[in-house]
Amino acid sequence: MHGESPIKRRESRKIWVGSVPVGGDAPIAVQSMTNSDTNDVAATVAQINRLEAAGVDIVRVSVPDMDAAEAFGRIKQQVKVPLVADIHFDYKIALRVAELGVDCLRINPGNIGREDRVRAVVDAARDRGIPIRIGVNAGSLEKDLQKKYGEPTPAALVESALRHVEHLERLNFKDFKVSVKASDVFMAVEAYRLLAKEIIQPLHLGITEAGGLRSGTVKSAVGLGMLLAEGIGDTIRISLAADPVEEVKVGYDILKSLHLRSRGINFIACPSCSRQNFDVVKTMNELEGRLEDLLVPLDVAVIGCVVNGPGEAKEAHIGLTGGTPNLIYIDGKPAQKLTNDNLVDELEKLIRQKAAEKVEADAALIARG
C-alpha cells in the first residue's frame, strides 16, 4: 500500500494530443506504435483496439505515402484513442492527415524539406489545433552534425533538437513536444538531461530500437527509469521488437515501480527457494494471466515462506505468506488460512473482491466531494 511518488517532476508546458494532456501536471502518458501495414485498415484498427484495452493513452501510426494517408483517415474514424501520424520526407502527407483529423504530427523538420514546406505543415497544424512532435534520432542525424561530431553524441542530438525547436519558434508555433532517442542507454539519458535544461516543452522519452521483449524491456527500464526518477519525462514509448501490447504493459510497469502512475495489480513476489510452502512461480503465472483485466491499482504480495512473507504481506492490500497452512493478509492484517488446494482460485476471488470494494470506496469518496 505504497503512497505517492517522492519524485519532483520537471516543469513543462502542457499540450493536448486529442483528449490526452501531455506535460505540465498531467499524468505521464503511455504510448505505443502499430506494426501492422497501415493500408490494412482492419488489421490496424484491431491492433489499436487491443492497445486501448491494454491501457494505451496515445498510438502512433506510420504513414509512409499518400495511400497510407487515406487509410489513416479511415482508421481514425473507427478508433477512440488519439492517433499520431509518423511522417517523413513528404510534407504533403502531413497536410493530408491534418485534413483527415490527426491528433498529432510526428515530424523531423530536417527531412521535411525547405522552409516553405515546414511552414505549410506548421500552418496546417496551427489552424487545426494539432500538436507536433519533433523526433530526433541518433540513426538519422543531419549530415552536417555527423561531420561536426564524427558520430552520434548526446550533444549532437541536442543540437539537432534545438535547431528544430528554434525553427518552430521562429514560426511562432509552441504546441509541440520533443524526443532525442538513441539505442545506447547512456547516450539517450545524457541527451535528455541536457535538453531538459534548455527547453520547457514536454519531453517524449524512449530508447529507440531497444531490442526484443527481454533485452528491450531491460534497456528501456534502465534508461527511462533513470530519467523518470530525476523528474524528466512527460510521455513514454517502450520500443520493442514484439507485440505492441507488451510495450504498454512494460510502460505501466516502469511507472508503477516509481509510483508515478498506477494501473492494475502491482505484484510483489519472491523468486522462491526450497523453503517455499507452495509453488510460487506457478501461482504467480496463473494470477498474472487471470487478473490482466483488472485495472484497479492494488498491491498483492505472494511470498512462499515466513522469512519475509509477513513483513511484505502487511504492506500489501492482499498478501499471501507460505506456511502450514498458508496465511492471507488483507489490508495488513491476518484474515484467513488457506491450504494449497484451490489456492489460486481463492486468491483470485479475494483480489477481485478487494478491487470491487476499492472501486466502491473511491466512488463514494468522489460523491462526497
From Swiss-Prot:
Keywords, comma-separated and alphabetical: 4Fe-4S, Iron, Iron-sulfur, Isoprene biosynthesis, Metal-binding, Oxidoreductase
Catalysed transformations (reactions):
(2E)-4-hydroxy-3-methylbut-2-enyl diphosphate + oxidized [flavodoxin] + H2O + 2 H(+) = 2-C-methyl-D-erythritol 2,4-cyclic diphosphate + reduced [flavodoxin]
The record's free-text note on cofactor binding: Binds 1 [4Fe-4S] cluster.
Q: What is its EC number?
A: 1.17.7.3
What's one Pfam family the UniProt record gives for this protein?
Answer: GcpE
Instruction: Locate the residues binding [4Fe-4S] cluster.
Output: C270, C273, C305, E312
Return one Gene Ontology term, BP aspect. terpenoid biosynthetic process
SUPFAM superfamilies referenced in this protein's UniProt entry, alphabetically: Inosine monophosphate dehydrogenase (IMPDH) (SSF51412), Nitrite and sulphite reductase 4Fe-4S domain-like (SSF56014)
What is the stated purpose of this protein? Answer: Converts 2C-methyl-D-erythritol 2,4-cyclodiphosphate (ME-2,4cPP) into 1-hydroxy-2-methyl-2-(E)-butenyl 4-diphosphate.
Q: Which family does it belong to?
A: Belongs to the IspG family.
This protein is called 4-hydroxy-3-methylbut-2-en-1-yl diphosphate synthase (flavodoxin)
What species is given as this protein's source? Pseudomonas fluorescens (strain ATCC BAA-477 / NRRL B-23932 / Pf-5)
